[in-house]
Amino acid sequence: YVISAYGAKQNASAAQNQKAINKLIALVSKKGGGTIVIPKGTWRTGAIEMKSFVELNLEEGAVLQFAFEPKLYPLVRTAWEGLACWNYSPCIYAYKVSDIAITGKGTIDGGGNNDTWWQWNGNPYFGYKEGVTKEHQKMGSRARLQKMAEDGVPFDERKFGMGQGLRPQLVNFVRSERILIKDVKMINSPFWVMHPLLCKDITVDGVTVWNEGPNGDGCDPEACENVLIQNCIFHTGDDCIAIKSGRNNDGRLWNKPSKNIIIRNCRMEDGHGGVVIGSEISGGCENVYAENCEMDSPHLERILRIKTNNCRGGLIQNIHMRKVTVGQCKEAVLKINLDYEPREACYRGFEPTVRNVSMEDVTCQKSNYGVLIIGGNKVENVYDIHVKNCKFDGVIKQPTKVTGKTRNVKFDNLIINGSLVLNKEDRPYQTYSEWLTHSEMQRVPQSYLLDFSKKPKWSYVMGIEMEGMLDTYLHYKGGKSTFKGADAEANNEAIINYLKEYPAKMIDEKGNITGYKYEDFNLDNVRTAKFILRMHNLFPSKSSELALKTLFKQLQNQPRTKEGVYWHKAIYANQVWLDGIFMGLPFYCNYAVQNLKPKKAKKILDDAVDQIVKTDLRTYDEKTQLWKHAWDETHSQFWANKEDGKSQHTWARALGWYVMAMTECLDAMPEDLSLIHISEPTRLQLI
């Protein structure tokens, strides 16, 4: 049955062709079924309604183009974002039919663009113009429909359509069965592209979807069962495939989980998610299998995503993905979030459950997260999540992030950025501080060879790192270690033995320090003195005492600017660096408080605060509100501004060190300031 033989014409109006095509569909169905052919050429039409036993076949080169004439889309029973209502007829619609098909190499064009349907979403990006666009979602239709559903307003009283701004789907089959959509290309949908609702036995095969419009989901089976989606290409403005089962009250009343769904051999490009469960998922979802797919786009946000909240409720279980190759995605390879749309106006307390989710043999070259799970705060309802034999490279922010209440989240041979991700219970240490400390000790068995050294080295790097190790030891000693081995305390004692090795190797009995030259007046070489001082307080020795006196003497005699601030080094004459403040002053303050009489200690602390304040005045840049890393009082260095002497550069490292210098100097000051006769205003000035 070729439509041109039954009244349809390429030069006819959309209304005329709509009438001819719908009349032919009814005739063929009444005769027991058959194939209706859309021949090569462009055929404008309004909404058409499929009937049982009818195949709509688009020949190669045929374009079935739906006109932007809202009056050609009469009210029908449908659902909009998971809520039952009467709304504009989808472009191709069916209700309570069976054995229908859309096939062929032709194109179905929904006519969506910024001058037609898309502007109705109320976003200027899609053509909406305040005061010009007459029909749009900003008129409150979406919120009104949501409230009707929340309040239990009967379905037949929820009438929208003309003047309400709720855009129609491209293809929407309702309460139908045995459906085939094969080989066609679908473009420019007003809203969701393919939306089977409360249907079963559906095959979508070889379909190409190109739709960059708002809410342009590719294929959204809702409350459907026995669905096969294969060999398809999705380039969408929203989720490529989003499995749904009704929103809130309506989904619970339908009580029809989407289930038994296979997705295979598909390619996903742009879109919010590759394979998505939710968020209109109140009826639940089970038995989803996605495999052998390719996904790649800087705009594709997630690969497998489950999104829901405690307005929805529902049980989501048995969701499996395997053998998927990903070039890049924008956010996460696997994301489960139970706080989707946290400000949604709805009745809450319907806690959803997500369980038995697996991802296996999935690779990804770039993403912000590998696995991102956001559980609920009240109920432990995300559990039995298994990621196995996956390899994610180029992960920028965090390999795995799991928050909220979860249980049995397992990583089995998950490699992220070249490193094996361990389950929390499988980690040798439950805290990163202990784990990192022992990892470093294993990597560099001799503490004096840290910083990739080939021979014993005196360096600020060693001092900074070993102070962190010392803090770890002090925090976890006395049976507090999280080591899972047989002897946790002995394992912790290994830290302090490692730290003892450094002063023993680097300082001889006369207090001479290997690699240190007093005459260099190098502040970098003083930083490690703070570590030595802390170790000396725990394990006093004559050699350390002598070395500390030498290092303090250096600071007493350190060359200074005319304003009294330390030069960074003798070879960096007249230069003040933020680095140097951190390298020298914390030891300067700590040593003074611990070893000098109160009046002398006060003088040292006042001097330290004065240097910090003057450094602030000389390095702060009003334009950027950051501190330049250095200042040259002669204004002659190649890096110095000739007018004010400030460096051209701001170093993130130096900013951090400058703040830590102030913090550590404050820590050195006793709580009872009267003990060293320091005034509170001096301390407040530093704060």
Outline where the language-model segments fall.
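Single conserved hydrophobic/aromatic residue that forms the stacking wall/gate
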Residues: H677-I687
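Well-ordered alpha-helical scaffold segments within catalytic/enzyme domains
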Residues: G463-A488, R527-S541, G584-K600, W657-S674
